[in-house]
From Swiss-Prot:
<dbReference type="InterPro" id="IPR004389">
    <property type="entry name" value="Ribosomal_uL18_bac-type"/>
</dbReference>
<dbReference type="GO" id="GO:0008097">
    <property type="term" value="F:5S rRNA binding"/>
</dbReference>
<comment type="function">
    <text>This is one of the proteins that bind and probably mediate the attachment of the 5S RNA into the large ribosomal subunit, where it forms part of the central protuberance.</text>
</comment>
<dbReference type="GO" id="GO:0003735">
    <property type="term" value="F:structural constituent of ribosome"/>
</dbReference>
<comment type="similarity">
    <text>Belongs to the universal ribosomal protein uL18 family.</text>
</comment>
<comment type="subunit">
    <text>Part of the 50S ribosomal subunit; part of the 5S rRNA/L5/L18/L25 subcomplex. Contacts the 5S and 23S rRNAs.</text>
</comment>
<protein>
    <recommendedName>
        <fullName>Large ribosomal subunit protein uL18</fullName>
    </recommendedName>
</protein>
<dbReference type="GO" id="GO:0022625">
    <property type="term" value="C:cytosolic large ribosomal subunit"/>
</dbReference>
<keyword id="KW-0687">Ribonucleoprotein</keyword>
<keyword id="KW-0699">rRNA-binding</keyword>
<dbReference type="Pfam" id="PF00861">
    <property type="entry name" value="Ribosomal_L18p"/>
</dbReference>
<keyword id="KW-0689">Ribosomal protein</keyword>
<dbReference type="InterPro" id="IPR005484">
    <property type="entry name" value="Ribosomal_uL18_bac/euk"/>
</dbReference>
<dbReference type="GO" id="GO:0006412">
    <property type="term" value="P:translation"/>
</dbReference>
<keyword id="KW-0694">RNA-binding</keyword>
Length: 120
């Protein structure tokens, strides 16, 4: 494995470990970022099920003209995910940035989710 992959894997493992310690039964908002799209889901780790999810690949996102690889798409995904989670009765989550730095698209998604009703 390359040094960058090892560093990213260690960062992801470190973030997940700290989340497990501080979760307190709250669901986890997990973010995955690829070069073309961004995905987010609210997961209940105790039951092992996904409560709500959203991605930039959904029809309503693509029809709005978002490419998926920019900050505007991340904001739209965060807003959509928060609306779905609040509708499912979830208001508090733990933010799992998945080893990604809290910057750019990840930060935009988190800020949009906060503005739309999720607290973390």
């Amino acid at each position: 494995m390359s040094r960058a992959k090892v560093t990213n894997a260690r960062r992801k493992q470190r973030v997940r470990l700290s989340l497990r310690r501080s979760a307190g039964g709250r669901p986890r908002l997990s973010v995955f970022r690829s070069s073309k799209h961004i995905y987010a889901q609210v997961i209940d780790d105790q039951k092992g099920e996904t409560i709500a999810s959203a991605s930039s690949m959904e029809k309503e996102m693509r029809s709005a003209g978002n490419t998926g690889a920019d900050i505007d798409a991340a904001k739209a995904v965060g807003k959509l995910l928060a609306e779905r989670a609040v509708k499912a009765g979830i208001k508090e989550v733990v933010f799992d940035r998945g080893g990604y730095l809290y910057h750019g698209r990840v930060k935009a998604l988190a800020d949009a989710a906060r503005e739309s009703g999720l607290s973390f």
